[in-house]
Amino acid sequence: MSVSLRELTVADAAVLRNISIATFTETFADSNSAADMELYIGQRFSENQLTQELANPESFFYTAEVQGQTVGYLKLNTGGAQTEPQQENALEIERIYVLGTHHGHGVGQALYQHALTIANQRAASYIWLGVWEHNHRALRFYQKNGFTAFGQHIFRLGNDEQTDILMKHDLNR
């Protein structure tokens, strides 16, 4: 399966909103209340919010496309855009999401490899992320790619406080 990646701009806010809502709902709706999902999606995936994030020069978005269809996306943060204080030369993967129909077909791996390429281009000392403690598929994916746990933080999904495991992959610089 051939996966092509495309960097998004502010003009792509609607595309980003559609894939964000689709993948987030698919991934988390069964494990969270409808009210919390609706609140979170309304806050984090509004076109206005995503336009602001796309305009941030320290954040980068990429879609994964298969046969012209958007099937996943990646959000990277550097500097002050990182969601937790980290070293200035760290790179955060805030989001990698792939539609369930494309799990196991190399789409997530292609997005991660692109993050690794960006980290190397920026001479990042490490890549880090937060992953929900109950998202076992994601935990396995990151462990397979060399990430190890280094802490945890609270992630608010709507009104529900959840625990994210913080993971990092040192790039040995």
Question: Over which residues does each language-model region extend?
Answer:
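Short coil/turn segments at alpha/beta junctions that flank glycine-rich nucleotide-binding fingerprints
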Residues: 105, 122-125
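Conserved acetyl-CoA-binding loop-helix of GNAT-fold acetyltransferases
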Residues: 104-117, 140-144
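Acetyl-CoA-dependent GNAT
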Residues: 7-13, 17-30, 38-101, 112-114, ...
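Extreme N-terminal starter segment of soluble prokaryotic enzymes
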Residues: 2-4
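Conserved phosphate-binding and hydrolysis motifs of nucleotide-dependent enzymes
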Residues: 68, 72, 106-108, 146
